[in-house]
Amino acid sequence: MSIKQWPEGERPREKLLERGAAALSDAELLAILLRVGTRGMSAVDLARYLLQEFGSLGRLMSAEVGKLSAYKGMGTASFTQFAVVREIGRRILAEELQESIVLSDPDTVADYLRFHLGQEKVEVSVALLLNRQNQLIAVRELSRGTVAENTIYIREIVKLALDEYADSLIIAHNHPGGSPEPSQEDIMFTRRLAQAMSLVDVSLLDHFIVTSQSVCSFRQLGLMP
């Protein structure tokens, strides 16, 4: 049965207009984005199938074009739509973070980092540079690569903070393997960085570890020096 044959109150677009986007399931939201299904499969059916295949909305929206194209009805057009949605979401979160007082709004920081880093396939490290009011000045990528390649030089982070006239900073990196638990190397690096930053009167406020499902804060774990 096509969506046009559904009762009007159950059609995703009509349901959104009547009840708001929050009332829709992941599959219904995705169906609106897909617009059409395939032969014998409505847009909602296709959305449910894709969500089951990829395991989550985040993994589906972050899939590479080659992987998407393996599924009937998907291809470069869908990849482009998903990339646009991801980037719009990232920019909205960045705007909210820019306007917020970071320490009083840790959930916004966590949401931004999960959206920014959670679906990365390799380890990526970033720095969030803050002013005296703990508002965001800039986000800078520090490194990108495998764990073996992902050596961050402390002096480069110190120089970055000074170049941006930051009063404090937050660092974050993702664990592509899925576990947010800090390693001993993560803990030791954080201690050395905090010590180095203190020499130039810049505070290291927190270190976050990000996965697709969760965000771990060193400060909340009591691991900040």
Curated annotation (Swiss-Prot):
Protein name in UniProt: UPF0758 protein NMB1038
Binding site for Zn(2+): H173, H175, D186
Keywords attached to this entry: Hydrolase, Metal-binding, Metalloprotease, Protease, Zinc
Taxonomic source organism: Neisseria meningitidis serogroup B (strain ATCC BAA-335 / MC58)
Domain of life, per lineage: Bacteria
Motif JAMM motif positions after renumbering to this chain: 173-186
Start and end residues of each MPN domain: 102-224
One GO BP annotation of this record: proteolysis
Molecular function terms from GO: metal ion binding; metallopeptidase activity
InterPro entries reported in the protein's UniProt record: MPN (IPR037518), RadC_JAB (IPR025657), RuvA_2-like (IPR010994), UPF0758 (IPR001405), UPF0758_N (IPR046778)
